[in-house]
């Protein structure tokens, strides 16, 4: 395992989780490379400036609370780290289960920053 890459990935995923739960994305941007590629099924964003302007959807749902299981990280070498993430959505106020979703997050780490983020819904 390439420990520095895994450490960067783990820190990034922790910060991303906090951003998704609070809507505060400010701690996310310093972890991204200037030429970051951010790829999701809904849209693609390229470059740090575009990320700062367009990642506004990273926020908590209005009527749901979001929980994350601890990410399972796999170091594929060469700065490539993959994580399977399980999310549980609950109704705000009651805590009643709404739904769950599994995602695969594929990261490329370069010079201690996330150079590429690709998220796919897998379940």
Predicted regions and their residues:
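Short, surface-exposed coil-to-beta transition loops
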Residues: 66-69, 98-104
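Short, low-complexity N-terminal intrinsically disordered segments enriched in polar/charged residues
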Residues: 1-34
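A solvent-exposed, acidic/Ser-Thr-rich amphipathic alpha-helical stretch
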Residues: 25-30, 34-75
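A short hydrophobic beta-strand element
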Residues: 77-89
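Hydrophobic alpha-helical core bundles mediating ligand binding, dimerization, or RNAP-core interactions
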Residues: 9, 13-16, 32, 51-55, ...
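Beta-strand residues in well-ordered beta-sheet regions across diverse protein folds
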Residues: 39, 84, 117-118
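Short, cysteine-centered beta-strand-loop-beta hairpins and adjacent loop/turn segments enriched
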Residues: 61-63, 89-99
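Short beta-strand edge/turn micro-motifs at domain boundaries
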Residues: 80, 100-123
């Amino acid at each position: 395992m390439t420990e520095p890459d895994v450490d960067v990935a783990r820190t990034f995923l922790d910060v991303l989780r906090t951003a998704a739960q609070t809507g505060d994305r400010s701690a996310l941007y310093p972890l991204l490379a200037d030429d970051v590629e951010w790829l999701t099924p809904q849209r693609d964003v390229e470059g740090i400036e575009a990320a700062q302007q367009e990642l506004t959807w990273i926020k908590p749902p209005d009527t749901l609370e979001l929980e994350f299981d601890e990410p399972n990280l796999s170091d594929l070498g060469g700065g490539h780290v993959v994580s399977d993430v399980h999310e549980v959505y609950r109704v705000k106020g009651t805590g009643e289960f709404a739904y769950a979703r599994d995602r695969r997050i594929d990261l490329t780490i370069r010079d201690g920053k996330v150079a590429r983020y690709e998220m796919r819904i897998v379940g």
